[in-house]
Amino acid sequence: MIRKIPSFIEVYKSLIQIPTISSNNKLLDQSNKNFIDLLSNYFSDLNFSVKNYQIPHTDKYNMLACVGSGNGGLLLSGHSDTVDFDEKKWTKDPFKLTETNNKFYGLGAVDMKGFFALILEVISSINIKKINKPIYILATANEETDMSGARNFIQSTIIKPDCIIIGEPTSLKLINAHKGHMSYSIKVIGDTGHSSNPDHGVNSIEIMHDVIRSLLILKKYFKEEYQHPNFSIPYPTMNLSSIHGGSAINRICPLCILNFEIRPIPGLTLTQIEIVIKEKLETIMKKWSHRIFIKKLFSSVPAYECPHNSGTIKIVEKLCQLNSAAVNYCTEAPFLQRIAPTLILGPGSIEQAHQPDEYLEHYFIQPTKNIITKLINKFCY
């Protein structure tokens, strides 16, 4: 017999109050085990079979809950972690769900613990004994950093659902494509000396000037050679995000570091970009091979697209009366897409994600429940 879980509000509160911060700063990074354990208990109480998987060499976990058997079905997916927060900028307790002005406030309220609370609310109100195909619920770790949860999941899972829905905050707009993300750091090492005799040193800023010139040529190349009409910015973008070098006005600069990012469009692979970067920097790298060093800052995320001619898109568009679109931010979709056709559709606005006093507006609640119900009815009954 299915045991009743707490109300939507109580579930939502309990999920928000467990810190699950993911950060590249080890002092801020937290385990998500308590959150995963709680979520697992809720789904177990609803007669789901639940398995938790530890991400190797970490204290982070994925959860896969399943009810029903056979091939196909529906996978509803979200990430368990949140970003860090600046306590000085929050006017409310980040770990206490606060309901006011027709909004739910809290860290992860929209990105994306509210989605799990809504899934549980829907599941608790339907007769899962009558389903013909499985319902899967996936909660991943580390989406906000290296996406190791999703990367690990696709390497080990054997499930093949008919459709995957990632409940990221899209304002309930259907997303079928997004750009990828690559980040690099270039370090130029010079030889210092007194500025009164520039020839007795090697100025790293001057070498970096030539590096930047090559990167700007690459930036122009991306804009001219690659286009995707579904994006508001229809070409791969490059951003020279930060540069640091020098210590004193009368000293030849011995070290200069430039960080930059590239956001590729679908159809342009990570490998292709790496090859082009090497080609554009080849001449200057040969000239200064012992002085120029390039490395990745974070794990790259490929661009993603679920093709418009996919039967899954047509089904979901018709079911939800929505047209699919493309966005510029990244999700776990390019990884989950390797398992089954994947779409992004969830409550709340991406504009509220990663912001002080993060919130989910009330008016998304019932429409989201309706959409989840329709998806389950279509793919599982």
From Swiss-Prot:
Keyword Hydrolase included in the entry's annotation: yes
Cellular compartments annotated: Cytoplasm
Pathway: Amino-acid biosynthesis; L-arginine biosynthesis; L-ornithine from N(2)-acetyl-L-ornithine (linear): step 1/1
InterPro entries: AcOrn-deacetyl, ArgE/DapE_CS, Bact_exopeptidase_dim_dom, Peptidase_M20, Peptidase_M20_dimer, Peptidase_M20A
Superkingdom: Bacteria
Chief localization: cytoplasm
GO molecular function, one term: zinc ion binding
Pfam families in UniProt: M20_dimer, Peptidase_M20
Record: residues binding Zn(2+) 2: 111, 144, 354
Primary role: Catalyzes the hydrolysis of the amide bond of N(2)-acetylated L-amino acids. Cleaves the acetyl group from N-acetyl-L-ornithine to form L-ornithine, an intermediate in L-arginine biosynthesis pathway, and a branchpoint in the synthesis of polyamines.
NCBIfam families according to UniProt: AcOrn-deacetyl, PRK05111.1
Quaternary context: Homodimer.
Similarity comment: family membership: Belongs to the peptidase M20A family. ArgE subfamily.
Protein known as: Acetylornithine deacetylase
Organism: Buchnera aphidicola subsp. Acyrthosiphon pisum (strain APS)
Gene name in the database record: argE
